């Protein structure tokens, strides 16, 4: 942490008391009736409303990631493509079945792979490179197992070969896609290395929710940062 120099050791200590394997994952289950998978419900009610992003899809394609076909649906041409921020590409891929295949598809809330990514970063910040690499590989292996049902040791070995903060956080971003955690990671680390939408007014990626005009007008003393 940029604020607390002891945060890495604390994160390591706490994480070692948490999930010990994929079987310990905290999962939200859905009965498929009135209680449906939220991504499924969203997509079912708004078919074609939201496409996959170009950055994420290209990242998986370029890495030949085994989770690609699970995370990303085929596009109109039978391949995998995403929309750039400034584009309205109706032919781009949509969410894959891993997230919203059926009304009863479960969602992972906290995973063993997330714990291992936390440990990988903590070890890296503590200068323990070999332990960081081992934790990073375990995190990737666990994520692939969660998503595909199989292991891919060769891919995980290659993906964990570079022990840098950027690679750790980028791999974590892939594994935790659709969760809020990668946004927090990006705000505190700057990774993954994203390019802001140059068609936007600010040409910057927001780092917090924008305060509405009514709030700034009626409660100005509490909204001076906006």
Ranges and model annotations:
Residues 144-146, 155-226:
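C-terminal functional modules
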Residues 4-119, 125, 133-175, 180-183:
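Hydrophobic-face positions in mid-chain alpha helices that act as interaction patches
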């Amino acid at each position: 942490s940029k604020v607390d120099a002891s945060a890495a050791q604390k994160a390591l200590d706490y994480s070692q008391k948490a999930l010990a394997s994929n079987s310990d994952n905290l999962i939200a289950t859905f009965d498929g009736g009135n209680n449906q998978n939220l991504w499924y419900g969203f997509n079912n009610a708004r078919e074609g409303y939201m496409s996959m992003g170009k950055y994420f899809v290209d990242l998986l394609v370029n890495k030949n990631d085994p989770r690609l076909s699970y995370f990303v649906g085929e596009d109109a041409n039978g391949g995998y493509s995403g929309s750039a921020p400034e584009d309205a590409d109706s032919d781009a891929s949509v969410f894959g079945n891993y997230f919203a295949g059926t009304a009863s598809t479960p969602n992972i809330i906290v995973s063993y792979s997330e714990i291992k990514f936390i440990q990988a970063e903590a070890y890296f910040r503590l200068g323990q490179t070999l332990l960081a690499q081992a934790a990073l590989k375990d995190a990737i292996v666990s994520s692939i197992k969660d998503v595909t049902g199989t292991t891919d040791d060769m891919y995980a070995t290659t993906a964990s070969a570079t022990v840098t903060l950027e690679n750790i956080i980028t791999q974590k971003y892939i594994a935790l896609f659709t969760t809020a955690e990668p946004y927090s990671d990006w705000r505190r680390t700057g990774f993954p290395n994203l390019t802001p939408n140059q068609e936007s007014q600010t040409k910057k990626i927001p780092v917090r929710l924008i305060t509405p005009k009514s709030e700034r007008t009626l409660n100005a003393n509490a909204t001076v940062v906006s």
